[in-house]
Amino acid sequence: MAIPSLKFYKESEYILSPEFGTTGSACFDIYSHFDDGHVPLWLDDKEARQARQTKRDSQGNIYVLIYPQERMLVPTGLTFDIPKDHSVRIHIRSSVALRDGLLLGNGEGVVDSDYVDPCYLILYNANNTARQIFNNTRYAQGELIKNYKYSLTEVKEAPGQKTEREGGFGSTDVKSEPSKGPSTGTSGLAI
């Protein structure tokens, strides 16, 4: 079976190519790219697309500020040529979410094979303070996914139980024994 190839076009020679961080990486890193100028901004309160002027830090690095609870369209400068029956899924890098408190505004980006325009990252600042979004920085990661064709069928009765599961949303972490402290789920982090 041939390995599919994800082709990409860079809008300029200064755009950093997506790349796998290690030989075992499931996803490829995606870099931000913007020049001196403006970065698109979506303001929740006005529901209008505006732009914010870029700045330079003391080392000359280009950045733009994203304020608390704001969403910003961060350009990548990349257009993907996605194989038929595939899509690209875009995720925030875990270090960016943990260290910087930045998330993808749509949770997960989905780029369809028939979308042939430049890709943006919808960054959301979940912090109480402003953050700097730097040019040529790895904020997201992408993966090529095989799409499976399926139909949607309405049924007249609610689905019945298929396993021993009892309870609704989030019930797989609920035990019938009394709790002896905070639930740690499967990650080891207290919730």
List the model feature ranges, each with a label.
Residues 1-191:
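DUTPase catalytic domain/fold
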